[in-house]
Amino acid sequence: METQGVMKEIQYEEFEEKIIEIRRTSKVTKGGKNLSFRVVAIVGNKNGKVGLGIGKAREVPEAIRKAISAAKRNIVEVPVINGTIPHEVIGRQDASKVLLKPAAPGTGIIAGGTVRAVVELAGIQNILTKSLGSTNPLNLALATMNGLKNLLDPRKVAKLRDISVEEVFKGVRRENNA
């Protein structure tokens, strides 16, 4: 039983953590205002795995711990091919939209603060992004995660269609050149 807990801890050690937002919130009650904190955190291994978590607590360190723990439970696998994403995708969350486009090697990460944090920890080195609509950090992070979740791995697409991976990419290039 204990070995399972140890294995999980070892698995989590490779993840890098970033705090995106720390927000002070208050609840007004009969006895006055109850202050608490909301933290948005991102974890990733810079090799195709990234997670987002939200933590709430009366103290900042406790909220950070909860956010990181939640992020480790919500890990998503991202298909990264030659340091970029396989195709263009739009992620949406409430009033926020994030456009994610693959980029040529050497382009780097063209992204704002929140989107940049998510993309860096996912292990993407070349990408073009554009944030549209609301710039709320939580919604931008969630929109980016939704976009990354919707990416299709070319190997899986090729297997489903019973064609080679090269043929999948030929179709993409033909559409872009037309």
Curated annotation (Swiss-Prot):
GO terms for cellular component: cytosolic small ribosomal subunit. Residues 15-78 form the S5 DRBM domain. Coiled coil: none annotated. The keyword DNA repair does not apply. The keyword DNA-binding does not apply. GO terms for biological process: translation. Keywords: Ribonucleoprotein, Ribosomal protein, RNA-binding, rRNA-binding. One of its GO terms (molecular function) is rRNA binding. It comes from the Bacteria. Belongs to the universal ribosomal protein uS5 family. Part of the 30S ribosomal subunit. Contacts proteins S4 and S8. The N-terminal domain interacts with the head of the 30S subunit; the C-terminal domain interacts with the body and contacts protein S4. The interaction surface between S4 and S5 is involved in control of translational fidelity. With S4 and S12 plays an important role in translational accuracy. Located at the back of the 30S subunit body where it stabilizes the conformation of the head with respect to the body. This is Small ribosomal subunit protein uS5.
